[in-house]
Amino acid sequence: MNLLAAGIAAGLAAVGGAIAVAIIVKATLEGVTRQPELRGSLQTLMFIGVPLAEAVPIIAIVVSFILLFT
């Protein structure tokens, strides 16, 4: 049962992280398309937002490993 729960948690975390990164990149590209002069600031915000969006799946995978090995 723990193996199944850990696998589901890791899989959902990976899918959630991929969706979050896709939304962030999509919004950045739309912003750059509308206002090319803001490219630098939008790119900076994207480079801050992507790791924050990836932090939650990484934590979920760590929790699933803890659940798996205890």
Curated annotation (Swiss-Prot):
Reversibly protonated during proton transport (site feature) positions: 54
Compartments, record wording: Cell membrane
Keywords (A to Z) from UniProt: ATP synthesis, Cell membrane, CF(0), Hydrogen ion transport, Ion transport, Lipid-binding, Membrane, Transmembrane, Transmembrane helix, Transport
Membrane topology, as annotated: Multi-pass membrane protein
GO molecular function, one term: proton-transporting ATP synthase activity, rotational mechanism
Pfam families found in the cross-reference section: ATP-synt_C
CDD domains: ATP-synt_Fo_c_ATPE (cd18185)
Main subcellular localisation: membrane
Gene Ontology CC terms: plasma membrane; proton-transporting ATP synthase complex; proton-transporting two-sector ATPase complex, proton-transporting domain
TM segment ranges: 5-25, 47-67
Oligomer and partners: F-type ATPases have 2 components, F(1) - the catalytic core - and F(0) - the membrane proton channel. F(1) has five subunits: alpha(3), beta(3), gamma(1), delta(1), epsilon(1). F(0) has three main subunits: a(1), b(2) and c(10-14). The alpha and beta chains form an alternating ring which encloses part of the gamma chain. F(1) is attached to F(0) by a central stalk formed by the gamma and epsilon chains, while a peripheral stalk is formed by the delta and b chains.
NCBIfam families, per the entry: ATP_synt_c (TIGR01260), PRK06876.1 (NF005363)
Function (record text): F(1)F(0) ATP synthase produces ATP from ADP in the presence of a proton or sodium gradient. F-type ATPases consist of two structural domains, F(1) containing the extramembraneous catalytic core and F(0) containing the membrane proton channel, linked together by a central stalk and a peripheral stalk. During catalysis, ATP synthesis in the catalytic domain of F(1) is coupled via a rotary mechanism of the central stalk subunits to proton translocation. Key component of the F(0) channel; it plays a direct role in translocation across the membrane. A homomeric c-ring of between 10-14 subunits forms the central stalk rotor element with the F(1) delta and epsilon subunits.
Family as reported in the entry's similarity comment: Belongs to the ATPase C chain family.
Alphabetized HAMAP family for the sequence: ATP_synth_c_bact
Name of the protein this chain belongs to: ATP synthase subunit c
Species in which this protein is naturally found: Halalkalibacterium halodurans (strain ATCC BAA-125 / DSM 18197 / FERM 7344 / JCM 9153 / C-125) (Bacillus halodurans)
Gene, per the UniProt record: atpE
